[in-house]
């Protein structure tokens, strides 16, 4: 029985990152964490392109454009949606998640879901580089690993 795993070497890989501007004080930290992790694992900064979109709802469209361009080994999607007093949160979270997942399945390109969906601002801050780690960094690791798993198959 073969065990297929992916290493964490990003040398020679190209990444697209789609980041939402809404809640950018959190998303800037997610983006920095992702880029830092990609570079630490061998990616060349010149092989990392970033696109900014208005909010999490708009991420899937740009992720799909990147995924179908043939330029990227993986696309990382970063954003933050914080629950408010209306149901808007539910719609944005659900559609962003569905859209991002659909892009990966439709294109065969790894598309990593790095949209924080939190109950409050404190939870978002915790996941952007404080006590709960940096989810942008974790998404970058996931992107590297899944690209290498797919190459090994």
UniProtKB/Swiss-Prot annotation:
This is 6,7-dimethyl-8-ribityllumazine synthase. It comes from the Bacteria. It catalyses: (2S)-2-hydroxy-3-oxobutyl phosphate + 5-amino-6-(D-ribitylamino)uracil = 6,7-dimethyl-8-(1-D-ribityl)lumazine + phosphate + 2 H2O + H(+). Belongs to the DMRL synthase family. 5-amino-6-(D-ribitylamino)uracil binds at residues 22, 56-58, 80-82, 113. (2S)-2-hydroxy-3-oxobutyl phosphate binds at residues 85-86, 127. Keywords: Riboflavin biosynthesis, Transferase. Its EC number is 2.5.1.78. It is an enzyme of class 2 (transferase). Transmembrane segments: none annotated. NCBIfam families: lumazine-synth, PRK00061.1-4. The active site is at 88 (proton donor). Pathway: Cofactor biosynthesis; riboflavin biosynthesis; riboflavin from 2-hydroxy-3-oxobutyl phosphate and 5-amino-6-(D-ribitylamino)uracil: step 1/2. One of its GO terms (biological process) is riboflavin biosynthetic process. PANTHER family: 6,7-DIMETHYL-8-RIBITYLLUMAZINE SYNTHASE, 6,7-DIMETHYL-8-RIBITYLLUMAZINE SYNTHASE DMRL SYNTHASE LUMAZINE SYNTHASE. The gene is ribH. Forms an icosahedral capsid composed of 60 subunits, arranged as a dodecamer of pentamers. The lineage of its organism: Bacteria, Pseudomonadati, Pseudomonadota, Gammaproteobacteria, Pasteurellales. It holds the Pfam family DMRL_synthase. GO terms for molecular function: 6,7-dimethyl-8-ribityllumazine synthase activity. Catalyzes the formation of 6,7-dimethyl-8-ribityllumazine by condensation of 5-amino-6-(D-ribitylamino)uracil with 3,4-dihydroxy-2-butanone 4-phosphate. This is the penultimate step in the biosynthesis of riboflavin. One of its GO terms (cellular component) is riboflavin synthase complex.
């Amino acid at each position: 029985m073969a065990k297929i795993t992916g290493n964490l070497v990003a040398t020679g890989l190209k990444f697209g990152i789609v980041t939402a501007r809404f809640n950018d004080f959190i998303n800037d930290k997610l983006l920095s964490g992702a880029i830092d992790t990609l570079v630490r694992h061998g990616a060349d900064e010149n092989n990392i392109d970033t696109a900014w979109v208005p909010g999490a709802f708009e991420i899937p469209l740009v992720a799909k454009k990147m995924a179908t361009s043939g330029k990227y080994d993986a696309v990382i999607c970063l954003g933050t949606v914080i629950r408010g007093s209306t149901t808007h949160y539910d719609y944005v979270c659900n559609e962003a998640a569905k859209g991002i997942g659909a892009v990966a399945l439709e294109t065969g390109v790894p598309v990593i879901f790095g949209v924080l969906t939190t109950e409050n601002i404190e939870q978002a801050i915790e996941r952007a580089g404080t006590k709960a780690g940096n989810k942008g960094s974790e998404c970058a690791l996931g992107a590297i690993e899944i690209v290498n798993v797919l190459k090994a198959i």
